[in-house]
Amino acid sequence: MKTNYEIRYAAHPEDARSYDTKRIRRDFLIEKVFSADEVNMVYSMYDRMVVGGAMPVKEVLKLEAIDPLKAPYFLTRREMGIFNVGGPGVVRAGDAIFQLDYKEALYLGAGDRDVTFESTDAAHPAKFYFNSLAAHRNYPDKKVTKADAVVAEMGTLEGSNHRNINKMLVNQVLPTCQLQMGMTELAPGSVWNTMPAHVHSRRMEAYFYFEVPEEHAVCHFMGEVDETRHVWMKGDQAVLSPEWSIHSAAATHNYTFIWGMGGENLDYGDQDFSLITDLK
């Protein structure tokens, strides 16, 4: 196995206004989340979130501590949320064994020393997408399915934004230090998410898009309300959203995305909305 990581530094919104397409994609887009028998990570300076993916095929993959953590093991001072977006797989945390099927999630609290990822069937490998944030204490590990989620049905087909927001790793479902994660599924015929757009200066966010057909794409919108930019994305890619940035998208097909947040509070509703007509 191999662990790959890179560090992404934070940008001032006034500086980001001058970024060209190449720079925007370099600083915010995470193009390669999954590689066979590898663990890929981005260590972001936005609330020190780590965004990553593990795709075990022929090997069992270990969650290794990367140098920026300066810690004996990855979850020494961190918590983690994991979603399986591939074939059936297993996550082992110490002596605990968690079977994760498609679109099932797992919360791991601080203190888990030995964490591994494996696939049940190498022909249909699991894809474990994860977010990790600093944690001040340990909370119990817990598997969460859509049946456990707080579900909000939003939008309309006429508005091209009919979707179910599955709040899965949130404080209404289980205790966390600062991590919140969930999964939004757009209905056929709907392509817009998070519109009207909002920001939450108390928290950063990361989006991971999947269930995007190969011949289709997602246009992710970011930036300040009056200085928006776009990032064209494919399926199985992620994007970082600073606390000062909107995070929205439209696509050429319906899709699903996983959102993960961390920062000042655990209040999902702490959002500063903007009018659609104010976007520039």
From Swiss-Prot:
Family membership: Belongs to the KduI family.
Any Gene Ontology biological process: D-galacturonate catabolic process
Any one Pfam family match given in the protein's UniProt record, by short name: KduI
Gene Ontology MF terms in the entry: 4-deoxy-L-threo-5-hexosulose-uronate ketol-isomerase activity; zinc ion binding
Reactions accelerated catalytically: 5-dehydro-4-deoxy-D-glucuronate = 3-deoxy-D-glycero-2,5-hexodiulosonate
Transmembrane segments: none
Name by which UniProt lists this protein: 4-deoxy-L-threo-5-hexosulose-uronate ketol-isomerase
Pathway given in the UniProt record: Glycan metabolism; pectin degradation; 2-dehydro-3-deoxy-D-gluconate from pectin: step 4/5
Enzyme Commission designation: 5.3.1.17
Cofactor remark: Binds 1 zinc ion per subunit.
CDD domains: cupin_KduI_C (cd20491), cupin_KduI_N (cd20294)
This protein's record includes keyword Isomerase: yes
UniProtKB keywords: Isomerase, Metal-binding, Zinc
Record-listed Zn(2+) binding positions: 198, 200, 205, 247
